[in-house]
């Protein structure tokens, strides 16, 4: 399994509008990626930790799953990817950093 992560680290004046747009508009484009298995959206969740840790500042983390690196490469070179990149300019306001990363997953338990 290969996952492609897109991390939105920062803030939006309206996180709800950003997430709604992503789910209702952008996800429909991502669904057109060849051989995509799933799209999982991760949002911040309240949590407590008895130890001092550095908290992240991720507003939204999108995880797209593929069976192989070859499937991911096909998706990244597809017309749907170009449409997704164009759609990014229509997102609600967001200030921060967007990073992209592919990782191979291994289920341990």
Q: How would you label these PLM feature ranges?
A:
Residues 1-109:
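Macromolecular interaction modules
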